[in-house]
Amino acid sequence: MSYKFPDNLNYADTHEYVLEENGLLKIGVSEFAIDQLGDIVFVELADEGATLEKGETFGTIESVKAVEEVYLPFSGEIVSVNESVIENPELLQNDPIGEGWLVILKPESKASIADLMTSEEYQSKVVPK
């Protein structure tokens, strides 16, 4: 399978992607990780307004193969939850980078996106040459 690695995304070691928009962080899971999970059957996410620490679980993705937790790459408050993904888990599978985003985070302090991998670095980690 051919995966998309948009240049405007950064990635955590645990396969979450981050898109910075106007000081907020849109967080989702990479196409690569979603493909590894297989058919997604259930998504559970933290509540809007929840304040979580970096590395804490903010949700669970259940597939026919496994149940995986998703982790926050930065501390902050969840200001928006993608209810569409909860109601229709296939969105995550069909468009993880577009309509399949998970949460929007207001970071506790200035988030340093530079601490995450660039798209190129992430691609070289997950796609064998």
From Swiss-Prot:
Q: Which domain of life is it from?
A: Bacteria
Q: Where are the transmembrane segments?
A: none
PTM-bearing positions, type N6-lipoyllysine: 65
The protein's UniProt keywords, in alphabetical order, are: Lipoyl
For activity, the cofactor(s) needed are: (R)-lipoate
Gene Ontology cellular component list: cytosol; glycine cleavage complex
Give me any GO biological process, just one.
Answer: glycine decarboxylation via glycine cleavage system
Q: Which CDD domains match?
A: GCS_H
- Cofactor-binding details, from the entry: Binds 1 lipoyl cofactor covalently.
In this protein, which residues make up the domain named Lipoyl-binding? 24-106
Q: What does the record give as the function of this protein? A: The glycine cleavage system catalyzes the degradation of glycine. The H protein shuttles the methylamine group of glycine from the P protein to the T protein.
The record ties this protein, via HAMAP family, to: GcvH (MF_00272)
**In which family does this protein belong, per the annotation?**
Belongs to the GcvH family.
How would you summarize the oligomeric state and partners of this protein? The glycine cleavage system is composed of four proteins: P, T, L and H.
What is the protein name for this chain?
A: Glycine cleavage system H protein
Give the source species.
Prochlorococcus marinus (strain AS9601)
